[in-house]
Amino acid sequence: MITSKDRSIVRELAKQVRDRAELPIMEARRALWYQHNDLKTTRPIIATFPEVAWHEIIPPESLQCENEEFRFMETILRGKLFRADVIRDDVPIERTWEVTKIITDDGFVKDGKGHASVANNPDYRDNCLGGINYLWLHSYKFNPNAGHFDPIIKEYEDLDLIKTPEVTYHEKESMEKLAIHQDALGDILDVQFRGQKWLYFAMMETYTNLRGLQEVMEEIYEEPEMLEDGMERFAQAYHELLDQYVKYDLLDLNNDQSYSGSGGLNYTHDLPKYPGGAKDTRNFWGFCESQEFTMVGPEQHWQFVMKHEAKMAERFGLFSYGCCEPADKKLKYILTIPGIRRISVSPWADVEVCAEQIKDKAVYSWKPMPSTFINSFDAMEPLVRRMLEATKKHGCCPEIVLKDTGTCNNDPASYGRFTELCRRLIEEYYG
């Protein structure tokens, strides 16, 4: 049931978001992102994504709406206002309000077998092509306890369980959702109906979730043929999964405020490149990462995983690579990925080595250590300085992406202090 109270709450919040979006600073931030992603400026850009810590910023008990769909709207709207008023980073507030088509699939394993979550979370369902919200919702539940893991793929013949997910578009439910959002917000914000925009291909993560991380590491030496075969099958399945999204017109162009790779935004004038719009994946950003291969050498990383990721990248106009895995020892391969435009420089990567090799060939997407931000804020300044010195010396196009903060120690204002720190240092180094 939708009450007048719920409707009044989200409409008032939407008006505040609209007002923030129309501020001149937001247009300046959009222009900065376009220059940044098009590799036309070396001035660092700042983007913060609190992720799990959104639970502390907007606690579920603080929400005023009662209807579940309106609680979703309220959460997103309050998140946008928090970004504009407290974080104050370079992420612009847009007047657009996207309603995403409801799309599901039946997974990569025959007979419906599979783990809903290796994190032992019954409320989490992995979208096989990837999906990301503006913020982590109040309804997400995470069990911090360890859970027993029983691999589905135990023997070589179990690879025959792998299949291509079959996609289903729930049009009726999607249109009903669109109508609710349009009715509530359509005269205030620009409500847009959108398909999949964040295109994420987690080949090794998918295999590891079914095989087990220790088992995969052992396979490298004991059964490399099995690992090669398994990755060939998952690569083919991901290609066929993407084909379905194209065939059923379930994609929407992502050269806008869409989340990019493992952090950042997709604003660019370099896309779209070809006629056909969303029917041609060459007009999109794509994204791959292989965190599970962090401790594996560059040659084997290429042999077992990255060659498949590079093949996937051929289908896209621009590509992001990496997440938490350190890139410094693998850049000779990463830089050969077709269309590479954003490279994750994780907290464990050597910032100097990465700066020397990346230069202005791609966006240098630096992720400061979130545990330092959480536990020792005063230690953040030397980390930021070290990155700024390295990237300025080598003429990089850097961005500072604070993410993976599992908590903010119930101090939401700390995100604003981090932005202030970064702005002060950027001004010192760049003027």
Language model features: what each stretch is:
Residues M1-E51, I57-M73, G79-R83, D90-I93, ...:
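Active-site loop segments of alpha/beta catalytic cores
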Residues L39, I103, G114, Y140-F142, ...:
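A generic structural signal for solvent-exposed, polar alpha-helical segments
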Residues D85, P92-V118:
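N-terminal accessory alpha/beta regions
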Residues K110, D126-N127, N143, T208:
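Compositionally biased, low-complexity repeat tracts
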